Amino acid sequence: NGFEWIDEEDSYDENGVLKEGLYSQAIFFSDNGTFDINNWYNIGSSTAYVYLEDGNIVTFDACTNPSAEDYPIIPEKLVEATYGKHNGTYYALRMHDFGDNHSRIKLEYQNPKFPNNDYIEGANIHKAGENNYTAVGSTGPVSAGCFLIDINRWDEFIGHFNRKSKVAVVASRNGVKSPLNRNVNYKPDLKIVRFTKPWILE
């Protein structure tokens, strides 16, 4: 996936600001090929590999497909996520393209729900429904294009982030079951994640 760990002394400018293109946290979502649109419970069809600031990696069961076929699928690309409210209710990670202030992610096709748009807006990383339900319920879809995390470990997941967090996110759409890390020289004392076209898998 192109994750590369950069020594901390090479990661900040003279003002102590993280250099452009570098992230202290990142998430890679796998694709294990088990998602079934007819299944109401698809948590575990993806794994979220969370790269932490301390150099450790933790994993969470996840789902990166929407609850119904008439909602868009975020393509395999690098996006950014920031800490914010999901539907005004609880804190989650709000995804968007780089430099976008409207929580939009450009798609590679027309949005099936809104055919006049080639983007998805308001896609978050949030917890799954009750008992890890991932389908369409009485109040609508659990995911209208969002990424879902195991509800039983949600507090642990979101606890790794805060209002200052700026997180790099990429989801596999090519059946990649775990991060390749082919250009990674991983050392536990190296804390910064830099991406080099992570969606181009060698």
Residue ranges of predicted features:
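Cell wall/extracellular polymer interaction/catalysis modules
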Residues: 1-140, 154-202
